[in-house]
Amino acid sequence: YINSPVARYKDELYNLPFNMNTFSKMWNIRTPQEAKEIIEKQRKETGITDPQNLEEQALFLGGRDIYEKLIKGYTEKQWGRDCRELPAFIIKRLPVRLTFDNNYFNALYQGIPIGGYTKMINNLLKDIKVELNVDYLENKQKYNSIAKKTIYTGAIDAYFDYKFGNLEYRSVKFENELLDIPNFQGNAAVNYTDKDTPWTRIIEHKWFEFGKDIDGNDLPKTVISKEYSSEWKLG
């Protein structure tokens, strides 16, 4: 599996990460030099030299077209905040590639375990005692007594019983649908970057397994998940 997401801005589709396929579609250009010149021109037009928030940082790094179509709406849905209210350091750099390469990662190897992560985790947990639906914070003494060291991976403010206040978390909700068609979007992940679409992305799970079941058979139906970002509230 190669991670090559697609961005959908209204009725326009763009390849991610930002590369020559993206720029060719956006500006009807063919060469890296053309893309470089457009990005540099748009960057200078902003007049920004010392970005003070995420919007200014994105404009400073990539220009207005990339920001307006592929960053602004998507980011504001994820964070639930106007980009001008978010700190600049969230986007330290933009992965702008002047090649026709849709591979999101540069790693030599990438993939997904055969059969998925559930199968892999089940294999890892063989002969290991697992307790589900228990709360460490309600049973600290019990769990601390059975091991020399305990690794806590829950909310850090809850660990301290909120005596320092509670942190602002974001949450994610998924809506799953089984569709009576073999192919919904032709790609594992499509990000919806306009602000008016309520979900941030749609995942079509079969494309993580090349559209086939574990026996290599084509699948006549497909499962999609719509991802929504939302505010998390205590209780």
Residue ranges, per PLM feature:
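Conserved FAD-binding subdomain of flavin-dependent enzymes
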Residues: 1-2
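Short acidic-hydrophobic surface loop/beta-edge motif
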Residues: 5-9, 190-192
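Short capping micro-motif at the N-terminus of alpha-helices
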Residues: 16-18
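Mid-domain catalytic core of redox enzymes
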Residues: 134-235
